[in-house]
Amino acid sequence: MVGGSSAQKLTTNDALAYLKAVKDKFQDKRDKYDEFLEVMKDFKAQRVDTTGVILRVKELFKGNRELILGFNTFLPKGFEITLRPEDDQPAAPKKPVEFEEAISFVNKIKTRFQGDDRVYKSFLDILNMYRKENKSITEVYHEVAILFRDHHDLLGEFTHFLPDTSATASTNDSVKVPVRDRGIKSLPTMRQIDLDKKDRIITSHPNRALKTENMDVDHERSLLKDSKEEVRRIDKKNDFMDDRDRKDYRGLDHDSHKEHFFNSKKKLIRKDDDSAEMSDQAREGDKFSGAIPSSSTYDEKGHSQELAFVDRVKAKLDTADNQEFLRCLNLYSKEIISQPELQSLVSDLIGVYPDLMDAFKVFLAQCDKNDGLLSGIVSKKSLWSEGKCPQPTKSLDKDTDREREKIERYRERDREKERLEKVAASQKWAKPISELDLSNCEQCTPSYRRLPKNYPIPIASQKMEIGSQVLNDHWVSVTSGSEDYSFKHMRKNQYEESLFKCEDDRFELDMLLESVISATNRVEELLAKINSNELKTDTPICIEDHLTALNLRCIERLYSDHGLDVLDLLKKNAYLALPVILTRLKQKQEEWARCRTEFNKVWADIYTKNYHRSLDHRSFYFKQQDSKNLSTKALLAEIKEISEKKRGEDDALLALAAGNRRTISSNMSFDYPDPDLHEDLYQLIKYSCGEMCSTEQLDKVMKVWTEFLEPIFGVPSRPQGAEDREDAVKSTNHDREDQEDAVSPQNGASIANSMRSNGPRKVNESNQVRQASELDKDVTSSKTSDALLSCDNTQNDKMPKNLTTPDERAETKQAVSIERAHNSNALPLDGLLPQRNGKISSLSVAGLSNSNPKPALTSGTEELKPNYVNGPRVEIGDNPVIPNGTVAEWFAGEAKVEREEGELSPTGDFEEDNYAVHGENDMEALSKSKENDATADDASAPRSSDGSGNTSHNGDVSGTDSGDGEDCYREDDIDHNKVESEGEAEEGMSDGHDDTEGDMPVLSISVKNLLHVKPLAKYVPPALYDKDNDDSRKNSQVFYGNDSFYVLFRLHQILYDRILSAKINSSSPDRKWKTSNPTNPADSYARIMDALYNLLDGTSDNSKFEDDCRAIIGTQSYVLFTLDKLIYKLIKHLQAVAADEMDNKLQQLYAYEKSRKPEKFLDAVYYENALVLLPDEDIYRIECEQSTPSKLSIQLLDYGHDKPDVTSISMDPTFAAYLHNVFLSYQPNAKENPRIYLKRNKRKNGGDDELCTTDEVKIINGLECKITCSSSKVSYVLDTEDVLHRAKRRKLLNQSGLPLAHDSVCSGSLIRQRRTQRYQKLLTGQ
C-alpha cells in the first residue's frame, strides 16, 4: 500500500485491505497482529489518543516500512510518521546504560512527584509487571506515556532506557521473546531480544538434553555480554526474583515459558558444535554469577606480575580452593561484592600464607588502577577457558551456589539501599522551596536567591516560547516570616492578642474611612466637571476613567447585596446616579467617623488594661514551672545534681591527703544583703499562720521560726505566741504571789507555781524589783528572794510552757540511756534546754524529749573570772534550773558541786558539755551550806506537807554543771540571771499543780533508774582545736540537718529573694513608664506589701494582685505572682518540722552544741552526734556567716571513706533487768535532812579555797569500761586512762633568795578587805 495524500478519500475497503496486509505480514506472528487490533480498539474507545497510537504502531511495525507508510494514509494531516532512509538499515546497538544514570533518573522521578506519591508508585508497579513478564514493552511504554503526559522531558529520557529493537525484525520468521534485560525489574532500562527461529536439531543423547534446552538462553547471554555487568548492578537494588523466575532466567524451565510466550510450536533443533560448546561454557560461567568475556582485553605482556600471582595462588591451593578464589575475583569484578568483603573471603583461603596476602593487596591495587584487568585474568585462568570442561555439577552443588548467590544479592541490595538513602539525604531536593536552606546560594537582591542547579524545576504545561524568555524559574524569594504564622521564638499571650485585635479593628475602620473619603472626593470632582459642562451630557461617560477600582469597590460595599446593580446604573446613567451616590457616601463618612470616635474610647480602655500585661511574657511559663520547682523532689534533686558534679577524683584525693576527713565545700551559697527583710518575713509568716493555723499550731510554728530559724541568720529572738499582749498583763499581776508560794515552807518542794501560766507571758523588770524588795523583809526567805532576783533576767521574753509528763517519755528515755551505755561515742543528746547567750541552762540524760529548744535574747551576764588553767571550772549558767528540793535547798547547795570521774563540762574541759545531778544523794551534795565547813553535811530542806517522799513536785529536773561555786551569792559584778520555767526543762516535767490539792506526780521506776545515768564523755584531742578560726566561728552558725531542714532553708531563701526583688525593683529609678506621678520608693514597697496582705487574707484576688505588682514594679514582677502559694507551702513545711520527732531532736542537738563556748565548739563532734541521729539519711551542713551581708552555705555531705559505723544494739532481757533493777536501782532515803535555819551564819565565800585547790590542775578523763551482757561483768578497756596533774607552786624570791614581803602584805590587805565586806553585808542583811 502506497502512502497517499491526506486529501484522498478512504473507504472501508481500504481499511480492510490494510488489515489483510498486516495479517499476511505477521501470519507467523499472530501476537503482533492481535496487539495491533488491541491498539485500534483502545483508540476507538478513546483510551489512547492519536499520539499514543502513532508511537505504538511505529514500535510494533518497526522494520516494516511499507506497513508504516500505509498506516500514514489513515492518519490526519500533520501526524504522519516520517522515516529516515537509515531506518531501513539495522541501527547500531545503543550505548550501554550506566547504573548511575538509571539511579539518577529514578531519583528525578521521585523528586518531581514528591507531592504525588501515586505517580511514583504507579511507575514502579509498571516496571515490576514488566520484570515479571506480565506486560510487554509496548504496554509499558504506553502506560508510562500516560503517566508522564505532562512531563515530556521525563518521557524523552525514559525512551533512552528502552531496549534496542533494531535487530528484531531482521527476518519475517523472527519472533519476540520477552526476557529480563538491563535490570528492568528495578529500573526503566528495557529491551527486547528476538531470537532466530531457525529449525534446530535436537540431539538424541539424553545427557545433552539440559544443554539443548538452555541453548537459546545461552546464546542470548553471549549476545548480551556487553550489558551483562550493568544488568547485575541494577539488579542489586530490587527484590530478588523467586525460584521460579530464577529457573526461567537460567532456562531450566524453558519449554513451559516457550509455550506461554510463543505461538510457534516448532521444535528446537540442535545447532552446530560451536553453539553447543558456547552453551556449555556459558552455563559453566553461571558459577561465576555471570557470563565471562570470551576474549581478553588486557595486555598479557604488561601484566605478567599479576598473572604470576594467580599462578602462585593456584600452586598453593588445591583445585576447589583455587576455583573458589577465582569465583571471588569474578564477583568483585562484577561489583557484586565490595573490596572489604573480597579481602575477608580471600583471607579465609590464603590467610595462612602471609606472603600471598601481601602480594594479594598489591595485586588488588593494580587491578583497581586498570579497568578490565581483573576480568581478563579471571577469564584466562578459569578452568573452562583453559579447555578443562568440568562435568555438570550435582544438584546439591547447584543449590549451594544458588543459595550463596541469593545471600550475596541480599547483601548487595542492602548496601545499595543505604547508599541511595545517603545520596537522597545529601541532595535534599525532595523538600519544598520554603524549607530549603538557600543562605549559601547566589543573591541578586536582599529578597531573591538563585535555586541550586540540581534542584528540579517543575515544567509549566501551557508555557509558550515568550513565557520561557520572560518568566523567572530560577530566582526565588526567601520567606523570612509571615503574619499568618505564629511567632516561633515567643508565644503571644492573651493580652497581646487583645491589642492585636484592637489594632486590626482600628486599621479596618481607618481604611474604610479613607476609602469613603477618597471616593467622595472623586465623585465630587466628577460632578463638578459635569456641572461645569466639561463633560457633555449627551455622550456616555466611561466611569472607569474617572473613578478607580478602589472607588468602585467602596461604592459597591455601600449598597451591600445591591452593589453590583448600583454599579450597572452608574455605568449606564452616571448623570443621575452620581448625586445619589455622593449623598450616600457623605452619610457613611459621617457615620463611620462618629463610630471611630466612640470606639477610640473603648480601645483606649483596652490599651490601658492590657498594655502592661502584654509586656509580661514570663509569668505564664513561670506559674507553670514554679509549683514544680518548689516541690521537695525538685529541691532535693537540684542539690544532689550539684553535689555529684563536684564529686570527683580530685575531691577524693584531697580527702585522702587530709587524713580521710570530710572536706567542707558548699554546694550552694546564698546572700542575705538586707537584714531588715527578716522582720517583713516574720510579719508575713505570722499573719499567714493566723489565717491558716489554730492557736496551738501557731505557737509551735512561730517557735520554730523565732527560736531556731531566725537566730541562725543573726536575728535576735522576739516574743512569740498568739496571746502575747494579754498574757503579759496577766503574768505581771501574778508574779508576786507565785514567787511567794514557791518559797513558802508548805510549797518548798517546787518552784513550778512561780512560773505557772496557761500561755506565754512577759516578765517586767520593775515588777521583779518590787517583788524582790517585798520578799527581802522575810528573814527566812531572804536567800530565796536574792536567788530569784539574780537568776531572773531583766528582759522581755515570752516563755510558753510546753510541758510533757515523765510518764509519757519513760520508754524513750530508757531506750536512749541504754544505747548510750553501750556507745561511749554518743553524746548526751536528750533533755536539752533552751540556751541563753550560747550556754545550756540545764541538761538531763534521762531521754530525748519532744519539747523544742527556745533561743532567747542575749542576756547581760558576765562569766566568773577563771582562776585555773586547763582545770575544772564552774560558771554561772545564763538560765540555771532549780533541781529537786525546795528553793532554799537549791541555793544552800550551790557552794560545792561534786564531780565524778568521767564527767566533764563543755565550758571547763574540752569534752562533754554538761552532766546531770540525779538522785537524792546528789541533791544532798548540792544542799551543803557555804557558810559551814565545806565537808559539813547539812540536811536538805523539808518537803511539802502533802508531798510524797520519793520525788519533788517538779519531777525529774537536773542541775547544770556550769553554775559557779559561789552561784547567786557572789559579791562580784554579776548581773542577775533570769530563772527558766521548769515547764521548759527537757526532762519533761508535768504541768504545775497547786500544792494544796496534793496532785504531785510520781515518777515511774524506769525514769527513776535513769536519774543515775551519767553522760558518757568522749575525749577530744586538743590538737583538733583550731584557734585560728575563733573569730569566724563566733560569727557563723553551723547546723546539721536532714532533708526536711534543707527544704526549710531553701523555701526561706526563695521567699527572702522574692521579697528582696520586690523591694529593689520598687525603688529602681528606671520606672518612668509606671506612673505619671513619682512616688516614694518606700511607699511603693509598702503598697506591694499591702497588696500581698490583701491577697493572703482573701480581700483581693490573684488578678488584682498581679495588676498592682505590674503597675508598681513592671515586667520584673512576675516572680511575685506565686508568693501566696510559696508562703502557704513554707507554713505547711514549718508545721511538719514542728510536729516531726526527728526534726525536734536535731534542733535539740543544735541547742546542745551551741551551749559550748564558741572557742570550744568543734565541728567534727557535732557531725558525729548528727550521724547518731541520722545514720542512714542524707546529712546537710548548713552554715550561716553573720557578716554583712549574711551568707548561707549548704553542703550535701558525702560520707566517702570515713562514714562511722553506728550500730544498733539489742539488749538481752536478762541483762536489761540487771541494769535497771540492780545497777541503776534507786532507793530514796526515808529520813530527810532538816533545812538550815540560820542561813546568814553560813560562810558565803567558802568556795574560794576550793577553787584555789583546783588551780593549775589538769584533768583528762579517758578511762573507758565495758560490760559483758552475758555475765554482767564490768572491765576496763586497755590503753585508756584518767590523768590528773597538779603543777607545784613556786614561791617568788627576791634577789636575796627570801620571799617577797610586799606580796605577803598585799595578800593580807586583800583578805582583810574581803572580810570587811562580808561583815558589812552581815550587818545590812543583804
Swiss-Prot record:
> Which key words tag this protein in UniProt?
Nucleus, Repeat, Repressor, Transcription, Transcription regulation
Q: Which residues form the PAH domain?
A: 8-78, 95-165, 292-367
Q: Name one Pfam family in it.
A: Sin3_corepress
What GO CC terms are in its UniProt record? Answer: nucleus
Specify residue ranges for compositional bias: Basic and acidic residues. 721-737, 967-981
* Stretches with biased composition (Polar residues): 744-757, 781-805, 844-861, 942-961
Residue ranges of the region described as Disordered: 272-299, 715-812, 844-864, 927-1000
- Tell me where in or outside the cell this protein is found: Nucleus
**Matching SMART domains, A to Z?**
HDAC_interact
Q: Which GO terms describe its molecular function?
A: transcription corepressor activity
Q: Which InterPro entries match?
A: HDAC_interact_dom, PAH, PAH_sf, Sin3-like, Sin3_C
The protein's job, in short, is: Acts as a transcriptional repressor. Plays roles in regulating gene expression and genome stability.
PANTHER family named in the record: SIN3A, ISOFORM G, SIN3B-RELATED
Q: What is this protein called?
A: Paired amphipathic helix protein Sin3-like 4
Organism of this sequence: Arabidopsis thaliana (Mouse-ear cress)
